[in-house]
Amino acid sequence: MAIKSYKPTSAGRRHQTCSTFEEITSTTPEKSLLVKIKKTGGRNHFGRVTARHQGGGHKQKYRMIDFRRDKRGIPAKVATIEYDPNRSARIALLHYTDGEKRYILAPLDLKVGDTVLSGPEADIKPGNSLPLRSIPLGTIIHNIELKIGKGAQLARSAGTFAQLMSKEGKYSQVKLPSGEVRLVLQDCYATIGQVGNIDHENVCLGKAGRSRWLGKRPKVRGVAMNPVDHPHGGGEGRTSGGRHPVTPWGIPTKGYKTRTNKTSDRFIVKKRTK
């Protein structure tokens, strides 16, 4: 994948960059793996906003992705590499030898015509899914399960990867993209390689409208609001807010720790570094 830029024919074009999509081999998704999505605009069933700055955006259909990789021992051929509007990574359509079709996240260097396999006996090559106990130490992995059979939850966005650090007893130590080192059960499955579309982080949207296409609404500053809307609101003329930064609900922000302790914290060997 590469990034293309544009001639500055307008202010919005000046810094805009876009993917060349050269790795995409099909623009038509597999119909049997599509599901309708109803937009919520960030509202819950009461109609109240529970997730701010969401709404609008281009109409999309959800692609059913196989995060469980539970079709063990049956080889599959990569038919297409496709764009997915619901995630930053590209997806690959697999045709299994028994006739079934599934989507998976497309790892780096996976190409049309390649064969992938899921199971303890699979080779160590991009796209193959194995339990952590069958993966050599130091291997780059992604799409990692936290609970056996639940499906992958870690290292799924474009360009991300984790690394298998060590094995001890029934747990493996995995270094996550954040720098956190975590214990994961050795029977949990992970996929070999790094998630593709690694240049995604270098894309510059260039204009507000492109964010709106993605369903992102403007984030209004608290100091620009009225006192009824935000603790920083009001005042004559421009103000600094007059207090340490807080959320719209009065909770300190910008560095204030709000994360509560969980029982799963005992599986964190080393806290994240970024």
Curated annotation (Swiss-Prot):
The GO terms this record gives for MF are: rRNA binding; structural constituent of ribosome; transferase activity
In Gene Ontology terms, what is a biological process of this protein? cytoplasmic translation
Please give the PROSITE patterns that the UniProt record associates with this protein.
Answer: RIBOSOMAL_L2 (PS00467)
Alphabetically ordered keywords of this record: Ribonucleoprotein, Ribosomal protein, RNA-binding, rRNA-binding
Among InterPro entries, the record links this protein to: NA-bd_OB-fold (IPR012340), Rib_uL2_dom2 (IPR014722), Ribosomal_uL2 (IPR002171), Ribosomal_uL2_bac/org-type (IPR005880), Ribosomal_uL2_C (IPR022669), Ribosomal_uL2_CS (IPR022671), Ribosomal_uL2_dom3 (IPR014726), Ribosomal_uL2_RNA-bd_dom (IPR022666)
Q: Which spans are transmembrane here? A: none
Coiled coil located at which positions? Answer: none
What Gene Ontology terms describe where this protein resides (cellular component)? large ribosomal subunit
Q: Matching Pfam families, A to Z?
A: Ribosomal_L2, Ribosomal_L2_C
Q: Where is this region: Disordered?
A: 223-256
Any idea what job this protein has? Answer: One of the primary rRNA binding proteins. Required for association of the 30S and 50S subunits to form the 70S ribosome, for tRNA binding and peptide bond formation. It has been suggested to have peptidyltransferase activity; this is somewhat controversial. Makes several contacts with the 16S rRNA in the 70S ribosome.
Q: Which family does it belong to?
A: Belongs to the universal ribosomal protein uL2 family.
Q: Please describe the quaternary structure of this protein.
A: Part of the 50S ribosomal subunit. Forms a bridge to the 30S subunit in the 70S ribosome.
Q: What is this protein called?
A: Large ribosomal subunit protein uL2
Q: Which organism is it from?
A: Trichlorobacter lovleyi (strain ATCC BAA-1151 / DSM 17278 / SZ) (Geobacter lovleyi)
